[in-house]
């Protein structure tokens, strides 16, 4: 009879397979299925916010702000959701009315807005985005661009029901 040889490495490998299997049997969800967690409000996201910013087709040219809005949990795209966008641009600071506008999402949950080039404000090139209607929890985002010379920025929302 051959006796199996167990060293520390083979023991830990075998034990980890067992633990992973127990996690799946106990209702564990693979990481991919958990990717639609509700989007959390970012610190400073609501700075210079103006309620009910008007729906606009564009706020200038040269920079593209875009993203996808989904239902938290399921990842279902949300159509007709109003997203507000504002930033400091070549037109002026975040308080400049020409830098504030809202857009509606398409059937696939996508939104986009062409605007003037975003410029650094307090040393960081960034945008502000908001969802604040009644159907879902309010979310304010403040994504920072990797470089002030970037000409696009994407910010996605996973909205939790209110």
Where are these regions (language model features)?
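N-terminal secretory signal peptides
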Residues: 1-10, 19-25
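Generic hydrophobic alpha-helical segments
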Residues: 18-19, 74
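Beta-strand-dominated extracellular/periplasmic modules and repeats
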Residues: 35-162
């Amino acid at each position: 009879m051959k006796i199996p040889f167990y060293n520390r490495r083979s023991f830990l490998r075998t034990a980890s397979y067992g633990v992973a299997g127990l996690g799946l049997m106990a209702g564990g969800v693979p990481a991919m299925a958990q990717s639609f967690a509700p989007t959390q409000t970012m610190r400073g996201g609501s700075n210079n916010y103006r309620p009910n910013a008007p729906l606009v087709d564009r706020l200038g040219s040269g920079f593209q702000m875009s993203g996808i809005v989904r239902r938290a949990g399921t990842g279902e795209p949300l159509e007709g959701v109003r997203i507000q966008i504002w930033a400091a641009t070549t037109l002026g600071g975040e308080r400049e009315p020409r830098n504030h506008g809202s857009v509606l999402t398409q059937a696939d949950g996508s939104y986009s807005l062409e605007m003037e080039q975003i410029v650094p404000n307090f040393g960081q090139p960034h945008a502000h985005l908001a969802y604040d209607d009644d159907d879902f929890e309010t979310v304010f985002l403040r994504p920072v661009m990797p470089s002030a010379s970037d000409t696009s920025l994407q910010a996605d929302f996973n909205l939790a029901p209110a």
